[in-house]
Amino acid sequence: MNVKPEEITSIIKKQIESYEHKIQTVDSGTIIQIGDGIARVYGIEDCMEGELLEFPNDVYGMALNLEQDNVGCVLLGPEKGIKEGDVVKRTGRVVEVPVGEALIGRVVNALGQPLDGKGPIKCTQTRAIELEAPGVIERKSVKEPLQTGIKAIDSMVPIGKGQRELIIGDRQIGKTAIAIDTIINQKDKNVKCIYVAIGQKQSTVAHIVNTLTEMGAMDYTIVVSSTASDSAPLQFLSPYSGCSMAEYFMLKGEDVLIIYDDLSKHAVAYRTMSLLLRRPPGREAYPGDVFYIHSRLLERAAKLSDKLGGGSITALPIIETLAGDVTAYIPTNVISITDGQIFLESELFYAGQKPAVNAGISVSRVGGNAQIKAMKQVSGTLRLELAQYRELAAFAQFGSDLDNSSKERLEKGKRLVEILKQDQYKPMPVEKQIIILYAAVNNYLSDIKVSDIRTFEREFLEYVDTHYRDLGQKILDKKELTDDIKGELNTAIQEFKKVFLA
């Protein structure tokens, strides 16, 4: 083989000409302490608050404490294999999650990674998990109703698109059930749903996903899950991740319903992180900014102005109380941030009233504007009548003689309470709610035994479906009870009662 020296020199010359003098700098530091999912890193200059840091073994962390000589980080993965003295690199990015249509029907963790074994999620866009909430000018007042399908809520505590309505109560009395029923009720209503499970048992999340799949609700739902076995930082990040996924749809002009289940565990996860980072504890050992972590999350729920596409995020945060104490730190914080609360009472639940909504202290501060006129017409006196019934029922326990009008009120109250009961996973369309509440409020049920009320309701609605098929559609079209519709309703009730009481 004959190699010419000129060829070699020309190759060397080309290499020298194409050589570019470039210095690559990487801002890095070393771990000086690690444990309990917290790392202290020395030597990272100019680090941002909330910045992603790259640890060995493809694990990332988030910078939270920027101190004079070191940075306190929380790890977003296992700390196994990471030791003191390891090198940590800055990324210059904040925590982001994938967003887009590809997430619908999937179960993901707080970082948007799939948990359901259905393969990778092909999303082309990402979005920062912490973003500023829309300003005053970018918003519109709440005017459109968001139907939950639950009679007690849609009639007395109505929810509008863009509202934040708190669901609060003790453990195991149906808080999640209300949220899941609301998701099921959004079928064919063009509302995307996001269910964020924070610190729940894995079996509970699996059960919820199975229920939603059976009901066909996973076709428009994303489940973001950080279970009890996940680290505190992942539990802390999951609601913000879910909210960023929701904002993607809101900015496209769509309506989104997001459920945070529950923010009590979210606050506990944040308290854990803060105490491990040596931040000073405040009331109930929560850090001083625990109000801000919830307010900045819930303020991102909004009804956008027409200029921005008119999309909305409706948030239903859930808070767990201890022995019905709504005056504790986290419950009072979240009550003051939200636009009303649905209070569930264990006494009502154990007395067989499900959903156990306490009509006296449950309120919706803005939802009344969103309620359709027909529902306002039937539910106007409902809350007052129930309050009077509770008062009378407490008084009647002493066995004193009551006058006839009080007895009538008691009997009507019993029937109203019975009518507001509802089975789980059976949300009711608003027109059917109006029809049955109209019968209850206008004393048509006074001659029916309390024990037969649920049977009457079921059979009467079937009768209306068969013999007055267009009645429900008329109510939806007109959105109010005109004299014609009232006449038709009265006739239908009287006809059916003859058959029912025969």
Swiss-Prot record:
Matching CDD domains: ATP-synt_F1_alpha_C, ATP-synt_F1_alpha_N, F1-ATPase_alpha_CD
Membrane topology value: Peripheral membrane protein
Keywords on record: ATP synthesis, ATP-binding, Cell membrane, CF(1), Hydrogen ion transport, Ion transport, Membrane, Nucleotide-binding, Translocase, Transport
Main enzyme class: translocase
Catalytic activity: ATP + H2O + 4 H(+)(in) = ADP + phosphate + 5 H(+)(out)
Similarity field: Belongs to the ATPase alpha/beta chains family.
Descriptive protein name: ATP synthase subunit alpha
